[in-house]
Amino acid sequence: MAVSGLAGCSGKNSDNNSSAVSTVSVSESSAVSETADDESSYNKTVSSADSSPAPSDNISSAAQSSEESSKETSDKTSNETSNQDSVNEETSIAPEPSSKNAEESQKVQESSQISQPSKSDEKSEPEQKPESKPEPEPVTPDIPANDNDIGGIELYNELFRIENKVSVEISIDKSETDKLQADYLKYTGRNEAKKSEIYRKADLTVKVGNKSYTIDEVGIRMKGNQSLEPFYAQNGTPNICSFKLSFDETFDDKDEYGSSAKTWTDDKARKARKKRTFATLNEMDIKWNICYDNTNIREIYAAKLFESANVLVQKIGLSQLSINGNNYGLVKIYEPIDKNFLEKRLPESALGGDLYKCIWSDCNNSGKHTGRWRGATYKTDNSYGVQDNSEGIKYNFNLKTNKKSSDNESLKKFLNVINKSNVSKAELEQVLDVDYYASFMAASYFAGDPDDIRNNYNNHYLYFRKDNGKAIFIVYDNDRTLGITYGLNKNCATRNPYSSYAATQSAQENPIIKKTITHDTTAEFMYIRDKYASELKKLSQTEMLTSDADFNKMYNTAKSNYEGIITPYIRFANQEEIFQFSLNGNKNGGDRANMSFEQFRSQIMQTYNSSKP
Protein backbone atom coordinates (compact mmCIF):
# COMPACT_ATOMS: atom_id res chain seq x y z
CA MET A 1 0.00 0.00 0.00
CA ALA A 2 1.44 3.37 -0.97
CA VAL A 3 1.93 6.00 1.66
CA SER A 4 -1.07 8.29 1.38
CA GLY A 5 -0.33 11.94 0.85
CA LEU A 6 3.14 11.54 -0.67
CA ALA A 7 2.22 12.11 -4.29
CA GLY A 8 3.47 15.40 -5.67
CA CYS A 9 5.91 16.19 -2.86
CA SER A 10 6.22 19.90 -2.33
CA GLY A 11 9.98 19.94 -1.87
CA LYS A 12 11.60 22.79 -0.01
CA ASN A 13 9.17 25.33 1.42
CA SER A 14 9.78 28.82 2.62
CA ASP A 15 9.37 29.20 6.37
CA ASN A 16 9.14 32.96 6.37
CA ASN A 17 6.51 34.86 4.43
CA SER A 18 6.11 37.62 6.97
CA SER A 19 5.68 40.24 4.27
CA ALA A 20 2.70 38.39 2.90
CA VAL A 21 0.90 37.68 6.14
CA SER A 22 -1.08 39.82 8.49
CA THR A 23 0.02 40.06 12.12
CA VAL A 24 -2.75 39.84 14.68
CA SER A 25 -2.37 39.71 18.46
CA VAL A 26 -4.99 37.47 20.01
CA SER A 27 -5.03 37.68 23.77
CA GLU A 28 -5.87 34.82 26.08
CA SER A 29 -8.76 36.65 27.64
CA SER A 30 -10.44 37.19 24.30
CA ALA A 31 -10.13 33.48 23.66
CA VAL A 32 -12.42 32.79 26.62
CA SER A 33 -15.86 32.37 25.17
CA GLU A 34 -18.82 33.99 26.90
CA THR A 35 -20.80 30.97 25.73
CA ALA A 36 -18.55 28.31 27.17
CA ASP A 37 -21.43 25.89 27.38
CA ASP A 38 -22.12 26.11 23.66
CA GLU A 39 -22.68 22.62 22.32
CA SER A 40 -21.05 23.41 18.98
CA SER A 41 -18.29 21.13 17.76
CA TYR A 42 -15.80 21.09 14.95
CA ASN A 43 -15.61 18.34 12.40
CA LYS A 44 -12.27 16.50 12.48
CA THR A 45 -11.47 15.82 8.86
CA VAL A 46 -8.40 13.66 9.32
CA SER A 47 -7.18 11.76 6.27
CA SER A 48 -7.18 7.98 6.43
CA ALA A 49 -3.39 7.93 6.39
CA ASP A 50 -3.20 10.36 9.26
CA SER A 51 -5.63 8.78 11.67
CA SER A 52 -6.21 5.12 12.28
CA PRO A 53 -9.32 3.71 13.93
CA ALA A 54 -9.27 0.28 15.46
CA PRO A 55 -10.82 -2.36 13.21
CA SER A 56 -13.93 -3.00 15.26
CA ASP A 57 -17.55 -2.60 14.25
CA ASN A 58 -18.11 0.25 16.69
CA ILE A 59 -15.27 2.31 15.31
CA SER A 60 -16.18 1.57 11.72
CA SER A 61 -19.75 2.67 12.29
CA ALA A 62 -18.55 5.84 13.98
CA ALA A 63 -16.42 6.59 10.95
CA GLN A 64 -19.35 6.04 8.62
CA SER A 65 -21.59 8.26 10.72
CA SER A 66 -18.99 11.00 10.77
CA GLU A 67 -18.53 10.80 7.01
CA GLU A 68 -22.26 11.22 6.44
CA SER A 69 -22.55 14.17 8.81
CA SER A 70 -19.48 15.83 7.39
CA LYS A 71 -21.11 16.11 3.96
CA GLU A 72 -23.49 18.65 5.48
CA THR A 73 -20.84 20.61 7.37
CA SER A 74 -17.67 20.29 5.29
CA ASP A 75 -18.30 23.46 3.24
CA LYS A 76 -19.02 25.48 6.35
CA THR A 77 -16.04 24.02 8.17
CA SER A 78 -13.63 24.67 5.31
CA ASN A 79 -14.86 28.27 4.86
CA GLU A 80 -14.57 29.07 8.56
CA THR A 81 -11.19 27.43 8.81
CA SER A 82 -9.94 29.23 5.70
CA ASN A 83 -10.96 32.62 7.05
CA GLN A 84 -9.54 31.92 10.49
CA ASP A 85 -6.21 30.91 8.97
CA SER A 86 -6.07 33.98 6.76
CA VAL A 87 -6.40 36.12 9.87
CA ASN A 88 -4.16 34.03 12.09
CA GLU A 89 -1.26 33.30 9.73
CA GLU A 90 0.87 34.76 12.49
CA THR A 91 -0.78 34.39 15.89
CA SER A 92 0.66 35.65 19.16
CA ILE A 93 -0.81 34.44 22.42
CA ALA A 94 0.09 36.77 25.26
CA PRO A 95 0.24 35.64 28.89
CA GLU A 96 -1.53 38.60 30.46
CA PRO A 97 -3.45 40.63 27.84
CA SER A 98 -4.42 44.25 28.16
CA SER A 99 -8.03 45.28 27.82
CA LYS A 100 -7.20 47.08 24.58
CA ASN A 101 -5.80 43.94 23.01
CA ALA A 102 -8.77 41.99 24.28
CA GLU A 103 -11.16 44.37 22.50
CA GLU A 104 -9.14 44.25 19.27
CA SER A 105 -8.91 40.50 19.29
CA GLN A 106 -12.61 40.18 20.01
CA LYS A 107 -13.21 42.13 16.80
CA VAL A 108 -10.87 39.79 14.97
CA GLN A 109 -12.66 36.79 16.40
CA GLU A 110 -16.00 38.16 15.23
CA SER A 111 -14.73 39.13 11.79
CA SER A 112 -13.15 35.75 11.26
CA GLN A 113 -16.61 34.21 11.31
CA ILE A 114 -17.61 36.16 8.18
CA SER A 115 -17.11 33.94 5.15
CA GLN A 116 -15.24 36.42 2.93
CA PRO A 117 -11.86 35.57 1.42
CA SER A 118 -8.75 37.50 2.36
CA LYS A 119 -6.52 39.02 -0.34
CA SER A 120 -4.44 35.90 -0.39
CA ASP A 121 -7.58 33.81 -0.81
CA GLU A 122 -8.66 35.84 -3.88
CA LYS A 123 -5.64 34.58 -5.79
CA SER A 124 -6.76 30.97 -5.54
CA GLU A 125 -9.87 28.90 -5.15
CA PRO A 126 -10.00 27.51 -1.60
CA GLU A 127 -12.48 24.83 -2.56
CA GLN A 128 -10.01 23.23 -4.96
CA LYS A 129 -7.55 20.85 -3.31
CA PRO A 130 -3.93 20.76 -4.52
CA GLU A 131 -2.97 17.54 -6.23
CA SER A 132 -0.37 16.90 -3.52
CA LYS A 133 -3.08 16.74 -0.87
CA PRO A 134 -5.66 14.01 -1.43
CA GLU A 135 -9.23 14.75 -0.39
CA PRO A 136 -9.41 14.06 3.36
CA GLU A 137 -11.91 11.52 4.59
CA PRO A 138 -13.55 12.03 7.99
CA VAL A 139 -12.93 8.91 10.04
CA THR A 140 -13.65 10.02 13.59
CA PRO A 141 -16.66 11.38 15.47
CA ASP A 142 -16.89 15.05 16.39
CA ILE A 143 -15.45 16.36 19.66
CA PRO A 144 -16.40 19.66 21.30
CA ALA A 145 -14.63 22.75 20.02
CA ASN A 146 -12.13 24.42 22.34
CA ASP A 147 -12.29 28.21 22.19
CA ASN A 148 -8.80 28.32 23.71
CA ASP A 149 -7.18 26.23 20.98
CA ILE A 150 -4.64 27.66 18.57
CA GLY A 151 -4.87 26.37 15.01
CA GLY A 152 -7.46 23.64 15.44
CA ILE A 153 -7.68 20.29 13.71
CA GLU A 154 -6.42 21.70 10.42
CA LEU A 155 -3.13 22.72 12.03
CA TYR A 156 -3.00 19.35 13.77
CA ASN A 157 -3.01 17.67 10.37
CA GLU A 158 -0.58 20.09 8.73
CA LEU A 159 1.88 20.05 11.64
CA PHE A 160 2.70 16.39 11.10
CA ARG A 161 2.62 16.28 7.29
CA ILE A 162 6.04 15.25 5.98
CA GLU A 163 5.57 17.57 2.99
CA ASN A 164 5.41 20.65 5.22
CA LYS A 165 8.59 22.30 6.42
CA VAL A 166 8.24 22.84 10.17
CA SER A 167 10.39 24.68 12.67
CA VAL A 168 10.14 24.91 16.45
CA GLU A 169 11.86 27.93 17.95
CA ILE A 170 12.28 28.06 21.72
CA SER A 171 13.19 31.28 23.48
CA ILE A 172 14.20 30.72 27.10
CA ASP A 173 16.03 32.87 29.65
CA LYS A 174 19.30 31.61 31.11
CA SER A 175 17.68 31.66 34.54
CA GLU A 176 15.21 29.05 33.28
CA THR A 177 17.85 26.82 31.65
CA ASP A 178 19.78 27.00 34.92
CA LYS A 179 16.65 25.69 36.63
CA LEU A 180 16.41 22.86 34.10
CA GLN A 181 20.00 21.98 34.93
CA ALA A 182 19.29 22.15 38.67
CA ASP A 183 16.19 19.97 38.24
CA TYR A 184 18.30 17.30 36.56
CA LEU A 185 20.97 17.38 39.26
CA LYS A 186 18.37 17.30 42.04
CA TYR A 187 16.55 14.26 40.68
CA THR A 188 18.13 12.23 37.88
CA GLY A 189 21.69 13.15 38.78
CA ARG A 190 21.35 11.20 42.03
CA ASN A 191 19.00 8.42 40.93
CA GLU A 192 18.39 7.57 37.28
CA ALA A 193 14.91 6.29 38.13
CA LYS A 194 13.93 9.81 39.21
CA LYS A 195 13.31 12.81 37.02
CA SER A 196 11.80 16.22 37.44
CA GLU A 197 8.23 16.84 36.32
CA ILE A 198 8.52 20.59 36.88
CA TYR A 199 7.98 22.72 33.80
CA ARG A 200 10.14 25.79 33.26
CA LYS A 201 9.00 28.83 31.35
CA ALA A 202 9.77 29.52 27.68
CA ASP A 203 8.25 31.26 24.67
CA LEU A 204 7.55 29.25 21.56
CA THR A 205 7.24 29.97 17.85
CA VAL A 206 6.14 27.17 15.55
CA LYS A 207 6.29 27.66 11.79
CA VAL A 208 4.39 25.36 9.47
CA GLY A 209 5.04 26.23 5.86
CA ASN A 210 4.51 29.99 5.61
CA LYS A 211 2.36 30.26 8.74
CA SER A 212 3.77 31.18 12.13
CA TYR A 213 2.29 30.68 15.61
CA THR A 214 3.87 32.34 18.65
CA ILE A 215 2.84 31.26 22.15
CA ASP A 216 4.09 32.90 25.33
CA GLU A 217 4.75 31.07 28.59
CA VAL A 218 4.92 27.49 27.39
CA GLY A 219 6.07 24.87 29.88
CA ILE A 220 9.25 22.96 29.00
CA ARG A 221 11.06 20.12 30.73
CA MET A 222 13.61 17.53 29.69
CA LYS A 223 12.40 13.99 29.01
CA GLY A 224 13.80 10.52 28.53
CA ASN A 225 14.86 7.52 30.57
CA GLN A 226 18.34 6.16 29.93
CA SER A 227 18.81 8.87 27.31
CA LEU A 228 18.10 11.69 29.77
CA GLU A 229 21.04 14.11 29.99
CA PRO A 230 21.62 17.41 31.82
CA PHE A 231 21.07 20.58 29.82
CA TYR A 232 24.80 21.33 30.07
CA ALA A 233 27.74 18.93 30.31
CA GLN A 234 30.31 19.44 33.08
CA ASN A 235 32.48 21.58 30.80
CA GLY A 236 29.54 23.88 30.08
CA THR A 237 28.94 22.60 26.54
CA PRO A 238 25.25 22.04 25.77
CA ASN A 239 23.90 18.51 25.45
CA ILE A 240 21.34 17.64 22.82
CA CYS A 241 18.20 16.82 24.82
CA SER A 242 14.65 15.67 24.30
CA PHE A 243 11.88 17.89 25.66
CA LYS A 244 8.23 17.85 26.61
CA LEU A 245 6.23 21.03 25.98
CA SER A 246 3.06 21.88 27.92
CA PHE A 247 0.65 24.45 26.52
CA ASP A 248 -1.62 24.69 29.58
CA GLU A 249 0.95 25.17 32.37
CA THR A 250 0.03 27.94 34.86
CA PHE A 251 3.36 28.03 36.78
CA ASP A 252 1.56 28.88 40.04
CA ASP A 253 2.07 25.72 42.12
CA LYS A 254 3.96 26.98 45.18
CA ASP A 255 5.16 23.46 46.03
CA GLU A 256 6.94 23.32 42.68
CA TYR A 257 7.87 26.94 42.04
CA GLY A 258 8.22 28.37 45.54
CA SER A 259 8.70 32.12 45.66
CA SER A 260 8.87 32.31 41.86
CA ALA A 261 5.33 30.92 41.47
CA LYS A 262 3.24 33.02 39.10
CA THR A 263 0.52 35.19 40.63
CA TRP A 264 -2.55 35.41 38.42
CA THR A 265 -4.49 38.65 38.82
CA ASP A 266 -7.13 37.62 36.30
CA ASP A 267 -8.96 34.41 37.15
CA LYS A 268 -10.55 34.34 33.71
CA ALA A 269 -7.11 34.39 32.08
CA ARG A 270 -5.92 31.56 34.34
CA LYS A 271 -8.90 29.41 33.43
CA ALA A 272 -8.22 30.11 29.76
CA ARG A 273 -4.61 29.03 30.23
CA LYS A 274 -5.72 25.75 31.82
CA LYS A 275 -7.74 25.06 28.70
CA ARG A 276 -5.16 26.30 26.20
CA THR A 277 -4.16 23.85 23.48
CA PHE A 278 -2.04 24.11 20.36
CA ALA A 279 -3.28 22.29 17.26
CA THR A 280 -5.71 20.52 19.67
CA LEU A 281 -2.74 19.24 21.74
CA ASN A 282 -2.21 19.82 25.46
CA GLU A 283 1.42 18.77 25.10
CA MET A 284 3.97 17.99 22.42
CA ASP A 285 7.15 15.91 22.66
CA ILE A 286 10.44 16.73 20.95
CA LYS A 287 13.05 13.99 20.52
CA TRP A 288 16.50 14.13 19.03
CA ASN A 289 17.93 11.43 16.74
CA ILE A 290 19.52 9.34 19.48
CA CYS A 291 19.82 6.22 17.27
CA TYR A 292 21.49 8.19 14.46
CA ASP A 293 18.99 7.12 11.82
CA ASN A 294 20.50 8.83 8.78
CA THR A 295 17.24 8.50 6.87
CA ASN A 296 15.59 10.49 9.69
CA ILE A 297 12.19 9.01 8.76
CA ARG A 298 12.07 5.36 9.85
CA GLU A 299 9.85 5.90 12.85
CA ILE A 300 7.51 8.03 10.75
CA TYR A 301 7.39 5.39 8.02
CA ALA A 302 6.75 2.70 10.64
CA ALA A 303 3.81 4.77 11.92
CA LYS A 304 2.39 4.77 8.39
CA LEU A 305 2.79 1.00 8.34
CA PHE A 306 0.77 0.69 11.55
CA GLU A 307 -1.85 3.07 10.17
CA SER A 308 -2.19 0.93 7.06
CA ALA A 309 -3.05 -1.96 9.39
CA ASN A 310 -5.66 0.17 11.22
CA VAL A 311 -3.62 0.20 14.43
CA LEU A 312 -3.68 3.22 16.73
CA VAL A 313 -0.41 5.14 16.57
CA GLN A 314 0.57 8.69 17.46
CA LYS A 315 1.28 11.28 14.80
CA ILE A 316 4.99 11.93 14.27
CA GLY A 317 6.63 14.65 12.21
CA LEU A 318 9.96 16.33 11.51
CA SER A 319 11.00 19.80 12.57
CA GLN A 320 14.00 22.03 12.82
CA LEU A 321 14.72 22.92 16.45
CA SER A 322 16.35 26.15 17.50
CA ILE A 323 16.94 27.44 21.02
CA ASN A 324 17.62 31.13 21.52
CA GLY A 325 18.46 31.47 17.85
CA ASN A 326 20.93 28.56 17.79
CA ASN A 327 20.22 25.75 15.33
CA TYR A 328 19.91 22.43 17.16
CA GLY A 329 19.33 20.55 13.91
CA LEU A 330 16.57 18.14 12.97
CA VAL A 331 14.26 16.55 15.55
CA LYS A 332 11.03 14.59 15.58
CA ILE A 333 7.84 16.00 17.08
CA TYR A 334 5.19 13.74 18.60
CA GLU A 335 1.53 13.82 19.48
CA PRO A 336 1.19 12.55 23.07
CA ILE A 337 -0.93 9.50 23.82
CA ASP A 338 -3.63 10.84 26.12
CA LYS A 339 -7.36 11.59 26.25
CA ASN A 340 -7.11 13.89 23.23
CA PHE A 341 -5.42 11.11 21.28
CA LEU A 342 -8.23 8.68 22.10
CA GLU A 343 -10.98 11.21 21.33
CA LYS A 344 -9.65 11.63 17.80
CA ARG A 345 -9.67 7.91 17.10
CA LEU A 346 -12.43 6.15 19.04
CA PRO A 347 -16.21 6.50 19.16
CA GLU A 348 -17.60 8.34 22.16
CA SER A 349 -18.94 5.13 23.67
CA ALA A 350 -15.40 3.72 23.91
CA LEU A 351 -13.97 6.75 25.74
CA GLY A 352 -13.41 7.01 29.48
CA GLY A 353 -11.57 3.72 29.98
CA ASP A 354 -8.25 3.10 31.73
CA LEU A 355 -5.10 3.89 29.75
CA TYR A 356 -1.73 2.47 30.81
CA LYS A 357 1.83 3.15 29.69
CA CYS A 358 3.68 -0.19 29.72
CA ILE A 359 7.39 -0.19 30.58
CA TRP A 360 10.18 -1.76 32.65
CA SER A 361 10.10 -1.28 36.42
CA ASP A 362 11.55 -2.60 39.68
CA CYS A 363 8.60 -1.41 41.79
CA ASN A 364 5.90 -3.57 43.34
CA ASN A 365 2.28 -2.49 43.73
CA SER A 366 3.16 -0.65 46.94
CA GLY A 367 5.66 1.52 45.10
CA LYS A 368 8.59 -0.17 46.82
CA HIS A 369 11.79 -0.75 44.86
CA THR A 370 12.56 -4.47 44.82
CA GLY A 371 15.79 -4.32 42.84
CA ARG A 372 14.31 -6.80 40.38
CA TRP A 373 13.85 -5.08 37.05
CA ARG A 374 11.38 -6.61 34.62
CA GLY A 375 9.35 -5.59 31.64
CA ALA A 376 5.60 -5.49 31.17
CA THR A 377 5.35 -9.25 30.60
CA TYR A 378 1.62 -9.38 31.39
CA LYS A 379 2.15 -11.82 34.21
CA THR A 380 0.09 -11.49 37.37
CA ASP A 381 3.10 -10.29 39.37
CA ASN A 382 3.54 -7.20 37.19
CA SER A 383 3.01 -3.94 39.05
CA TYR A 384 0.48 -1.22 38.33
CA GLY A 385 -0.38 2.21 39.72
CA VAL A 386 0.11 5.95 39.23
CA GLN A 387 3.76 6.79 38.70
CA ASP A 388 5.62 9.51 40.59
CA ASN A 389 8.70 10.44 38.57
CA SER A 390 10.02 12.80 41.22
CA GLU A 391 10.27 9.85 43.63
CA GLY A 392 11.38 7.38 40.99
CA ILE A 393 8.21 5.32 41.41
CA LYS A 394 7.21 3.70 38.13
CA TYR A 395 5.16 0.61 37.49
CA ASN A 396 5.00 -1.92 34.69
CA PHE A 397 1.54 -0.52 34.00
CA ASN A 398 1.41 3.23 34.71
CA LEU A 399 -2.15 4.53 34.84
CA LYS A 400 -2.58 7.65 32.68
CA THR A 401 -6.33 8.26 32.93
CA ASN A 402 -8.85 8.00 35.78
CA LYS A 403 -5.96 8.35 38.22
CA LYS A 404 -8.20 9.19 41.18
CA SER A 405 -11.18 6.99 40.39
CA SER A 406 -9.86 3.77 38.86
CA ASP A 407 -9.64 0.57 40.91
CA ASN A 408 -7.60 -1.10 38.12
CA GLU A 409 -10.23 -3.83 37.90
CA SER A 410 -10.10 -4.01 34.10
CA LEU A 411 -6.36 -4.62 34.18
CA LYS A 412 -6.53 -7.14 37.02
CA LYS A 413 -9.27 -9.08 35.26
CA PHE A 414 -7.30 -9.03 32.03
CA LEU A 415 -4.12 -10.35 33.67
CA ASN A 416 -6.02 -13.07 35.51
CA VAL A 417 -7.77 -14.27 32.36
CA ILE A 418 -4.77 -14.38 30.04
CA ASN A 419 -2.67 -16.18 32.65
CA LYS A 420 -5.19 -19.00 33.18
CA SER A 421 -3.80 -22.31 31.97
CA ASN A 422 -7.18 -23.39 30.61
CA VAL A 423 -8.61 -20.07 29.48
CA SER A 424 -11.45 -20.49 27.00
CA LYS A 425 -12.12 -18.69 23.75
CA ALA A 426 -15.14 -16.96 25.27
CA GLU A 427 -13.15 -15.77 28.28
CA LEU A 428 -10.33 -14.37 26.16
CA GLU A 429 -12.63 -12.61 23.72
CA GLN A 430 -14.41 -10.97 26.64
CA VAL A 431 -11.25 -9.06 27.59
CA LEU A 432 -9.31 -8.78 24.30
CA ASP A 433 -10.22 -7.28 20.92
CA VAL A 434 -8.90 -10.27 18.98
CA ASP A 435 -9.11 -8.77 15.48
CA TYR A 436 -7.32 -5.62 16.53
CA TYR A 437 -4.70 -7.66 18.39
CA ALA A 438 -3.92 -9.71 15.27
CA SER A 439 -3.41 -6.53 13.23
CA PHE A 440 -1.27 -4.95 15.94
CA MET A 441 1.04 -7.96 16.23
CA ALA A 442 1.40 -8.34 12.46
CA ALA A 443 2.40 -4.71 11.97
CA SER A 444 4.72 -4.97 14.98
CA TYR A 445 6.48 -7.91 13.38
CA PHE A 446 7.27 -6.04 10.17
CA ALA A 447 8.27 -2.89 12.09
CA GLY A 448 10.95 -5.02 13.74
CA ASP A 449 11.45 -3.11 16.99
CA PRO A 450 13.54 -5.11 19.51
CA ASP A 451 12.22 -2.92 22.34
CA ASP A 452 8.50 -3.55 21.90
CA ILE A 453 5.74 -5.60 23.55
CA ARG A 454 7.02 -8.89 22.14
CA ASN A 455 10.79 -8.58 22.23
CA ASN A 456 11.55 -6.58 25.37
CA TYR A 457 8.10 -6.16 27.00
CA ASN A 458 8.37 -2.41 26.70
CA ASN A 459 7.23 0.74 24.91
CA HIS A 460 3.50 0.47 24.26
CA TYR A 461 0.18 1.57 25.74
CA LEU A 462 -2.73 -0.59 26.84
CA TYR A 463 -6.28 0.77 26.74
CA PHE A 464 -9.53 -0.73 27.99
CA ARG A 465 -12.50 0.43 25.95
CA LYS A 466 -15.36 1.77 28.03
CA ASP A 467 -18.09 0.31 25.82
CA ASN A 468 -17.06 -3.34 25.89
CA GLY A 469 -14.17 -3.53 28.37
CA LYS A 470 -11.85 -5.08 25.78
CA ALA A 471 -8.14 -4.35 25.64
CA ILE A 472 -6.42 -2.76 22.66
CA PHE A 473 -2.75 -1.87 22.26
CA ILE A 474 -1.24 1.40 21.10
CA VAL A 475 2.15 1.81 19.46
CA TYR A 476 4.69 4.00 21.26
CA ASP A 477 8.39 4.94 21.00
CA ASN A 478 9.30 2.90 17.93
CA ASP A 479 12.63 4.68 17.48
CA ARG A 480 14.47 1.36 16.99
CA THR A 481 12.54 0.19 14.00
CA LEU A 482 13.01 -0.91 10.38
CA GLY A 483 16.67 -1.85 10.72
CA ILE A 484 17.92 0.52 13.41
CA THR A 485 20.48 -1.45 15.39
CA TYR A 486 22.58 1.40 16.80
CA GLY A 487 23.07 0.81 20.53
CA LEU A 488 20.90 -2.33 20.56
CA ASN A 489 21.81 -4.83 17.87
CA LYS A 490 19.02 -7.41 17.99
CA ASN A 491 18.41 -7.77 14.27
CA CYS A 492 14.68 -8.44 14.12
CA ALA A 493 14.80 -8.99 10.36
CA THR A 494 15.90 -12.57 10.99
CA ARG A 495 13.15 -13.40 13.51
CA ASN A 496 10.52 -15.92 12.50
CA PRO A 497 7.06 -14.33 12.88
CA TYR A 498 5.88 -17.39 14.83
CA SER A 499 8.95 -17.71 17.03
CA SER A 500 8.48 -18.77 20.64
CA TYR A 501 11.45 -16.61 21.58
CA ALA A 502 11.93 -12.89 22.09
CA ALA A 503 14.63 -10.91 20.29
CA THR A 504 16.83 -11.41 23.34
CA GLN A 505 16.84 -15.15 22.50
CA SER A 506 15.08 -15.91 25.77
CA ALA A 507 11.80 -17.83 25.82
CA GLN A 508 8.71 -15.72 25.26
CA GLU A 509 7.22 -14.60 28.59
CA ASN A 510 4.10 -12.75 27.46
CA PRO A 511 1.20 -15.22 27.95
CA ILE A 512 -0.99 -13.61 25.29
CA ILE A 513 1.68 -13.98 22.64
CA LYS A 514 2.65 -17.49 23.74
CA LYS A 515 -0.93 -18.73 23.55
CA THR A 516 -2.02 -17.08 20.33
CA ILE A 517 0.62 -16.47 17.63
CA THR A 518 3.70 -18.63 18.26
CA HIS A 519 4.70 -22.20 17.56
CA ASP A 520 3.34 -22.94 21.06
CA THR A 521 -0.20 -21.85 20.18
CA THR A 522 -2.82 -24.24 21.52
CA ALA A 523 -5.65 -25.66 19.42
CA GLU A 524 -8.13 -23.41 21.26
CA PHE A 525 -6.50 -20.30 19.85
CA MET A 526 -5.30 -21.50 16.48
CA TYR A 527 -7.94 -19.26 14.93
CA ILE A 528 -6.14 -16.20 16.33
CA ARG A 529 -2.88 -17.35 14.81
CA ASP A 530 -4.73 -17.75 11.52
CA LYS A 531 -5.95 -14.15 11.82
CA TYR A 532 -2.39 -13.07 12.57
CA ALA A 533 -1.11 -15.00 9.53
CA SER A 534 -3.77 -13.36 7.37
CA GLU A 535 -2.75 -9.88 8.55
CA LEU A 536 0.91 -10.69 7.94
CA LYS A 537 0.07 -11.71 4.39
CA LYS A 538 -1.91 -8.52 3.73
CA LEU A 539 0.94 -6.31 4.92
CA SER A 540 3.57 -8.33 3.07
CA GLN A 541 1.78 -7.55 -0.19
CA THR A 542 1.61 -3.78 0.31
CA GLU A 543 3.94 -1.45 -1.56
CA MET A 544 5.35 -0.32 1.76
CA LEU A 545 7.07 -3.71 2.07
CA THR A 546 7.40 -4.94 -1.52
CA SER A 547 9.30 -1.89 -2.73
CA ASP A 548 11.60 0.87 -1.50
CA ALA A 549 9.75 3.45 -3.60
CA ASP A 550 7.45 4.86 -0.91
CA PHE A 551 10.25 4.99 1.64
CA ASN A 552 12.61 6.72 -0.77
CA LYS A 553 9.92 9.21 -1.72
CA MET A 554 9.36 10.15 1.92
CA TYR A 555 13.13 10.31 2.45
CA ASN A 556 13.65 12.65 -0.51
CA THR A 557 10.87 14.93 0.72
CA ALA A 558 12.45 15.16 4.17
CA LYS A 559 15.91 15.68 2.71
CA SER A 560 14.66 18.46 0.45
CA ASN A 561 13.09 20.27 3.40
CA TYR A 562 15.79 19.86 6.04
CA GLU A 563 19.19 19.03 4.52
CA GLY A 564 20.28 22.63 4.95
CA ILE A 565 19.77 22.56 8.74
CA ILE A 566 20.74 18.97 9.56
CA THR A 567 24.09 20.04 11.05
CA PRO A 568 23.65 21.78 14.45
CA TYR A 569 25.45 25.00 15.31
CA ILE A 570 27.77 23.12 17.67
CA ARG A 571 28.91 19.57 18.32
CA PHE A 572 26.99 18.67 21.45
CA ALA A 573 28.78 17.16 24.43
CA ASN A 574 26.77 13.92 24.23
CA GLN A 575 26.85 13.67 20.44
CA GLU A 576 28.58 10.48 19.23
CA GLU A 577 28.06 10.65 15.46
CA ILE A 578 27.44 13.31 12.86
CA PHE A 579 23.88 14.07 11.80
CA GLN A 580 23.27 13.65 8.09
CA PHE A 581 20.92 12.43 5.37
CA SER A 582 21.85 9.09 3.82
CA LEU A 583 20.15 5.91 2.63
CA ASN A 584 23.30 3.86 3.16
CA GLY A 585 23.67 1.36 5.99
CA ASN A 586 25.81 -1.45 7.30
CA LYS A 587 24.02 -4.57 8.49
CA ASN A 588 27.32 -5.94 9.80
CA GLY A 589 28.20 -2.78 11.70
CA GLY A 590 27.21 -4.12 15.12
CA ASP A 591 25.71 -1.73 17.63
CA ARG A 592 27.57 1.26 16.19
CA ALA A 593 25.70 1.32 12.89
CA ASN A 594 22.29 0.80 11.32
CA MET A 595 21.44 -1.37 8.35
CA SER A 596 19.81 0.41 5.46
CA PHE A 597 16.05 0.25 5.01
CA GLU A 598 16.62 -1.67 1.77
CA GLN A 599 18.70 -4.25 3.63
CA PHE A 600 16.12 -4.58 6.40
CA ARG A 601 13.12 -4.83 4.07
CA SER A 602 14.82 -7.40 1.88
CA GLN A 603 15.93 -9.51 4.84
CA ILE A 604 12.67 -9.49 6.77
CA MET A 605 10.67 -10.30 3.64
CA GLN A 606 13.01 -13.21 2.96
CA THR A 607 12.55 -14.41 6.55
CA TYR A 608 8.78 -14.07 6.35
CA ASN A 609 8.46 -15.81 2.98
CA SER A 610 10.47 -18.78 4.23
CA SER A 611 8.65 -19.06 7.56
CA LYS A 612 5.99 -21.54 8.54
CA PRO A 613 3.54 -21.43 11.47
Walk through the language-model features, giving the residues of each.
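Sec-dependent signal peptide cleavage junction
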Residues: V3-V26
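A conserved alpha-helical element in kinase catalytic cores
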Residues: I290-V311
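Middle-to-C-terminal accessory/interaction subdomains
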Residues: P144-D149, K165, D178-L180, E391-N396, ...
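Short, well-structured beta-strand/strand-turn elements
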Residues: A309-L321, I453
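Extracytoplasmic intrinsically disordered, low-complexity "stalk/linker" and propeptide segments
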Residues: S47-S51, S56-S61, S65-P136
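Internal "kinase-insert"/substrate-recognition segments embedded within catalytic cores
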Residues: E249-D252, K268-E283, W288, A309-Q314, ...
